[in-house]
Amino acid sequence: MKIVFAGTPEFAAQAMRAIHAAGHEIVLALTQPDRRAGRGMHLQASPVKEFALEKNIPVLQPETLRRNNKDPEKQQQAEDAYRALINTNFDAMVVVAYGLILPQEILDITQQAPRFGSFNIHASLLPRWRGAAPIQRAIEAGDAKTGVCIMQMEAGLDTGDVVLTADLAIASDETSSSLHDRLAALGAGLIVDALSLLQDGKGLSRTPQPALGVTYAEKILKAEADLDWSLSAREIDARIRAFNPFPGAISNLNAETIKLWKSRLADEDAYSEAGPIGAVIGFSEDGVFVRCGDGVIEILEAQKPGGKKMNAKTCLQSVDAPEKLLCFQTKA
């Protein structure tokens, strides 16, 4: 099949590579413009663009797909993308973490017979966690499972009919980083399955999303990273794992902002020492035990400003503390 692919990050690039490896021809790639990143703030291409260039796939990088934009340059970019889609011979469009809204006129192009339409890979079990950050929000909420849906796209935010789905369990030590990688692999395989069914003439059964159970995964804000130690140990552990790798959970410890990367729930009975909320009440071989609003958490990996990630015990023992009292400041 001939595919137009729209996506930007590594999650999308993995699906793109799988589609290519399955023998489908990607005839056009849409991705976000190059962005400045890294310590040198150099312009960097997206993983999708890098793969497209490697395979000599034409690439467009409009800042918007809305042709009614008031900025003449952006309007021209949108016009060029619109014309490219009209003039490209393709069977279906696959959209994965693209980062731009597809106007209805773009969706209409993909639905013109004999085309099959646009399909989106979404990293949740819809209708739970529609929106920008389904992986992080699933971990933060303490969900026991999540998965991937292949959705027939429409104008609403992740509201289209689901055509294929696959789920997996969320491990107790799961981080957003590890869950991202597992879901990327799951989604890549699932979109290949969907395209194979279309190619073989078997079609895809469309299941409308139920009205009940809708939740929204709002974009993660850096301000959320500041931990509130009055929460339960279970909630704090979930946030530390959800915010790894971005934005990284933080907390002030004796006037130093510490990033907390890895944690687990502790046996409170074994560490029942008294102490205020946020206090370090004990040490393990590699970690430290911190009193929470309800329960105790073991911090296993931490990072001081300008330093490297290291086991939490080594990291925190180097913090200057009067009378060796280590106490995280709870969020106001």
Swiss-Prot record:
Binding site for (6S)-5,6,7,8-tetrahydrofolate: S124, L125, L126, P127
Known EC number: 2.1.2.9
GO molecular function annotations of the record: methionyl-tRNA formyltransferase activity
UniProtKB keywords: Protein biosynthesis, Transferase
Catalytic activity: L-methionyl-tRNA(fMet) + (6R)-10-formyltetrahydrofolate = N-formyl-L-methionyl-tRNA(fMet) + (6S)-5,6,7,8-tetrahydrofolate + H(+)
UniProt keyword Protein biosynthesis, yes or no: yes
Pfam families given in the database record: Formyl_trans_C, Formyl_trans_N
Entry GO CC: cytosol
Statement: the UniProt record of this protein carries the keyword Isomerase: no
Physiological role: Attaches a formyl group to the free amino group of methionyl-tRNA(fMet). The formyl group appears to play a dual role in the initiator identity of N-formylmethionyl-tRNA by promoting its recognition by IF2 and preventing the misappropriation of this tRNA by the elongation apparatus.
Entry-linked PANTHER family: METHIONYL-TRNA FORMYLTRANSFERASE, METHIONYL-TRNA FORMYLTRANSFERASE, MITOCHONDRIAL
Family the entry assigns: Belongs to the Fmt family.
Protein name (database record): Methionyl-tRNA formyltransferase
